[in-house]
């Protein structure tokens, strides 16, 4: 995100759910957060965006509201929003996919170029495999350091099959900060 001229101006960084910025938010601003605390490896990435007017937006590729994951998220977006906040309620990502970080990047890249949240969500179809490939391809073209989607997907499915858990994965918190 730092390498993108449209994002670097307002990108605050990448954070675990329990270490979100406590200082006053400047507007516009954005960040990527993991739903896990700093003591866990990380399981799912989401994005926050605060408009120039002080409205807050929460983007989750599974379409969940902030309080689904953490009271910290709800407090953060409420504190950071001067007026109101909203979230996307449409599931976009495949259940066994592990490209949630790419969805967060996709959202912020488009949002930082002025595209509204609803318009970004409308880019996607009901075909989650198509959506997953689209965001991965988008990110891979712009940020070549992102790994191979097929390998990531196979690894995630194998790990989930062993644990019998829904689609989640682990990443390091700094994975997306230099893009």
PLM features: residue spans?
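Conserved active-site-adjacent core of cysteine acyl-enzyme catalytic domains
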Residues: 1-36
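Generic secondary-structure transition motif, activating predominantly at the C-termini of alpha-helices
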Residues: 2-6, 77-81, 128, 142-143, ...
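Generic preference for hydrophobic/aromatic residues in regular secondary structure cores
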Residues: 7-14, 80-87, 178
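Cysteine protease-like catalytic core of ubiquitin/ubiquitin-like
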Residues: 25-113
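C-terminal folded domains that constitute the principal catalytic or ligand-binding module
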Residues: 81-156
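Disordered regulatory segments flanking catalytic cores
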Residues: 143-179
